[in-house]
Structure formats: C-alpha cells, structure tokens
Amino acid sequence: MLKQIKSDIYHLLHPKMAFFLTSVSKNDKPNVMTCAWATPVSEEPPVVIVCVSKESYTAELIKQTKEFVINIPTKKLLGALWICGKISGRDTDKFKRAGLKIIKAKKVKSPVIDGCVGHIECKVWKTVDAGECYAFFGNVISAYADEKYMRNGLWTKEAEIPLHLGGARIVYFR
Ligand SMILES: Cc1cc2nc3c(=O)[nH]c(=O)nc-3n(C[C@H](O)[C@H](O)[C@H](O)COP(=O)(O)O)c2cc1C
C-alpha cells in the first residue's frame, strides 16, 4: 500500500551524494559547508546547481563572490562532513575545527579540500530564489577526479562516497 508522505518529501529523492561546498569572501577568507542538494542541469555547456539555505554563511559568500567548489569526499572524511554540516563558518574556522587541509583551486579563489576524490570548480551565472534556499547555477570552469577512484569516467566502488539518506543516516556508494 502506498502511504501519503507529508513531511521531508525531499527524502524520496535521497540518497544524494554528500560533499563539501567551499566558497570564499570578498577578502579571500574561505568557508566550507556540507551539502547534498546538487544536480547537473546541462551537459553542454556543463552546468550544475547547488541549493543553499539563505540562512547559511555559504549563501552570503556565494552571493558576494559568485563562485564555489564542489569537493567529493570518501568515507575517510565522514567526521569532517558532520562537523561542517552542523556549525556555521560565520564565527568558526571550520577547516581547522574539522581538520581539513586546503589547496589552491585551479581557476577560482574558493579552495579545494585535500583528500577529496573529485572537484568541480564553478562560477555562478544565475541565482534563483527558491524559497528557503538559493539555487546557484554554476558554470563548470574546471573538473577533475582522482584516477584511482574514477575509471573510464565512472566512480569505482572503492571510492566509498558518502550518500546522505536523510537526518543522521549515511550509506556508501559501493
Ligand atoms: C549530510 C548533510 C547534508 C546537508 N545538505 C545541505 C544542503 O544541501 N543545503 C544546505 O543549505 N544545507 C545543507 N546542510 C546543512 C549545512 O551544512 C549547515 O547548515 C551548515 O552549518 C552551513 O554552514 P555555513 O553557515 O558555514 O555556510 C547539510 C548538512 C548535512 C549534515
């Protein structure tokens, strides 16, 4: 029997990959938050959307500098993923708190997170007010992945990428 779903309707669309979304302020101060709401929307040109709460510091920064980086982690970074998803970078250095090392990105000022297996650097070309979130449409400027975990353009099961089911539940891509 099909049961009517009245709350957390979005859980029907999970699991979704949980990743680190990095951004930067006008004066080059970086931030990171955990994000799961993202999707490709165009292959040619390559465009992705990230959906970010209007209340987050990340939304403020992306609106300021119009860029972001998607950093895809493995199981090893699960602890950091929770930390970056629970506290705001407004008054905390989350990189330090979560023990994350940053590296310079190739084409944008937002940093890349060391130990992640895939990165998508984006410049925002359109922002849509989507209710409680902004949907930031990002033109993909550069994308690269660890060849140990991505073969022939596909993730291998060794990558063990965290997939968010909802709430505190994570499963792994295997
Ligand atoms: C697994 C997981 C997935 C999340 N996905 C999103 C998301 O897709 N969009 C969003 O706005 N917040 C999401 N969050 C919540 C943000 O990470 C959280 O509000 C964070 O503290 C914002 O940080 P900031 O204020 O430094 O930007 C998620 C949290 C977790 C733990």
Residue ranges and their predicted role:
Residues 1-174:
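Basic, polyanion-binding surface patches
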